[in-house]
Amino acid sequence: AGTQASAKCCTSDITLAEFRRLKGKMDGVNPNATTPEAYINGTPDWRTDLYASRGTLMTHAESIELFEQLGTKFTPELKSPSVEMPYGGGYTQEDYAQQMIDEYRAAGVDPADVYAQSFNLDDVLYWIENEPAFGEQAVYLDGRYGDESFDHADPSTWDPDMADLADKGVNIIAPPMWMLVSTEGDDMVDISRKSYEFFV
């Protein structure tokens, strides 16, 4: 009693045919649930599931084709694997990072339209080194705010710091919005500008 419900639902051995039989639903859970069915039936009351309970799942390659038709740019995030890497005896993190880029190459997408993203700095550095046309605008999603020694308002705690990242070829860094601005009294303070000035 008093403990919120939680669950982790994933698999590493699903086939493409099995994946295609699934239906997408709006993300949301009921933390007060006592059954699996109630847990996944967690759409907030102010939303509707009328159009969000039978979504057709797509592969990454299929999503590229759709976005090409819609004329959009691409911001794919290489998700952290839920399995130990290398997986299955030989599939490495580098293979995983390369596979994502290969699908854009196979579709003939202009690298300038792709902003590959990852919270794993090594992924971004891999793209910079091995796929420079894509790596030039690869995005480092900065998740270091979870580290105890990291203070987003104190550049002396940043490792690597902005200068180090720039030296490694990282041109775009994306921290959460709350790390970029703060308040002092009634004034909004641009932390990102203050941090930039720290290194100039």
Model-derived features: positions:
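Metal-dependent phosphodiesterase/phospholipase catalytic core, i.e.
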Residues: 1-125, 129, 133-137, 141-146, ...
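C-terminal active-site rim and adjoining tail of enzyme catalytic domains
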Residues: 94, 135-200
